[in-house]
From Swiss-Prot:
It comes from the Bacteria. It is found in: Cytoplasm. It comes from Sphingopyxis alaskensis (strain DSM 13593 / LMG 18877 / RB2256) (Sphingomonas alaskensis). Pfam families: RuvX. Keywords: Cytoplasm, Hydrolase, Nuclease, Ribosome biogenesis. InterPro entries: RNaseH-like_sf, YqgF, YqgF/RNaseH-like_dom, YqgF/RNaseH-like_dom_sf. CDD domains: YqgF. This is Putative pre-16S rRNA nuclease.
Length: 152
């Protein structure tokens, strides 16, 4: 099941269990995880993309190792809310996650990377460290937005 509605996604999830947030780029996939009570999201890691089968294997290992029950995938919309070419590729990526057998929430990721980068600059994180952590931190920002919407 793939949806853009947080209530539908929440209804498809078992009670409890961790969620994973994904910030899908052309070169990397930023990964974040939340606690089983859906209170807070934390950056986890960045997967360097190769081919989709390798990406799927890495995500299968994550799902199994972290007991993930649902995925929140950042959806890159244009500023006016319309689809962009990246939106279509992200929707295709989400459809290709079907072998994982998990519900998928496509969540608006507008401003996520910019907000995270501003926070890192304000915290005086070096440019090298920002580059290392930006994708997983953006995934945490996306995931936190989704869990906040589900637990209101």
């Amino acid at each position: 099941m793939i949806t853009t509605a947080a209530p539908d996604f929440a209804a498809a999830l078992p009670n409890g269990g961790r969620l994973a947030g994904l910030d899908v780029g052309t070169k990397t996939i930023g990964v974040a995880l939340c606690d089983a009570g859906w209170s807070f999201a934390s950056p986890d890691k960045t997967i360097v993309r190769k081919r989709f089968s390798a990406d799927l294997d890495a995500l299968k290992a994550l799902v199994a190792g972290q007991a993930v029950v649902g995925l929140v995938v950042g959806l890159p919309l244009n500023m006016d809310g319309s689809d962009s070419p990246r939106t279509q590729s992200t929707r295709a990526f989400a459809r290709n996650l079907a072998p994982l057998g998990l519900p998928v929430l496509l969540w608006d990721e507008r401003w996520s990377t910019a907000a995270v980068e501003r926070a890192m600059i304000a915290a005086d994180v070096s440019r090298a460290k920002r580059a290392e952590r930006i994708d997983s931190a953006a995934a945490a920002f996306i995931l936190q937005g989704a869990i906040d919407a589900m637990t209101r």
